A protein has these predicted regions:
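Non-catalytic cap/lid and distal C-terminal segments of serine-dependent acyl enzymes
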Residues: 1-242
Length: 242
């Protein structure tokens, strides 16, 4: 099922596209792309958008470019990456604008992200309380200790150091989560090891046993839309179960 209509806005450094379902929207789904993916990647490369529209979700697509959902731009951030949106762009500019226009509904909105966008889901939920009803992070990177030389992290934060550990560490920030979380990762992921999601799940089991967290680790699955389409469907089922 397609959208009844779509509108595009520019807020701060972020382009945002809103797609309305044919029937009146019942809830909102914010779709987060991975590093250097188009905001429309979910819709162009999977059935997730059409399935969500058919279920009555309003879709919000955000253009993040080469963002890693860092809290801010730092002195060490690569010059050619500085103009991309950050976590602060979303929290201080984009989400308030969406709320003001009535496109984002507190308590009836959900987050779904793939790859770096999965990291973004945890970063956003850690800073927004109960604005969102739940989140789903697919193939995300959460534990900076797994690869201290990661080129995306060093490109934003500089060499491994206190900032990785104390400022933008999704693993530790996850302890702040106030809403349910769905995690999924392929065991054959060649880009983001599945240990990222496994460690996050284990960390939350230990630190936040009160939090609803579901983790699906999938044998033979990789870092691609074959997996993300299936896991995206699971995420929608998870949201509907709450």
């Amino acid at each position: 099922m397609g959208a009844a209509w779509a509108q595009t806005f520019s807020w701060g450094t972020c382009t945002v596209e809103v797609r309305e379902p044919i029937r009146p929207a019942q809830r909102v789904l914010v779709l987060l792309p991975g590093w250097n993916y188009s905001r429309r990647c979910w819709c162009d490369s999977s059935r997730v958008c059409s399935l969500a529209l058919a279920k009555g979700y309003r879709l919000i697509l955000v253009e993040m470019g080469k963002s890693i959902y860092a809290s801010d731009v730092f002195p060490e951030t690569r010059a050619d990456w500085r103009h991309y949106p950050t976590l602060r762009t979303l929290i201080d500019t984009v989400f308030p604008a969406l709320l003001e226009k009535g496109f984002l509904w507190s308590g009836r909105s959900y987050l779904l992200g793939l790859s770096t966008g999965g990291r973004g889901v945890v970063m956003i939920l850690a800073h927004t309380g109960r604005l969102f009803r739940a989140g789903a992070a697919l193939s995300g990177d959460f534990d900076p200790h797994l690869d201290p030389k990661d080129r995306l992290l060093t490109g934003w934060y500089g060499p491994y150091g206190p900032r990785w550990e104390n400022v933008d560490n999704p693993l530790s920030l996850s302890e702040r989560l106030q809403v349910p979380l769905f995690l999924a990762h392929g065991q054959n992921d060649p880009f983001v090891p599945h240990l990222h999601s496994r460690r996050l799940y284990q960390h939350l089991q230990k630190k936040r046993p009160d939090l609803t967290v579901v983790y699906r680790e999938v044998p033979h699955a990789g870092h691609d839309f074959t997996f993300w389409e299936q896991a995206g469907e699971w995420a929608l089922e998870f949201f509907e179960s709450l």
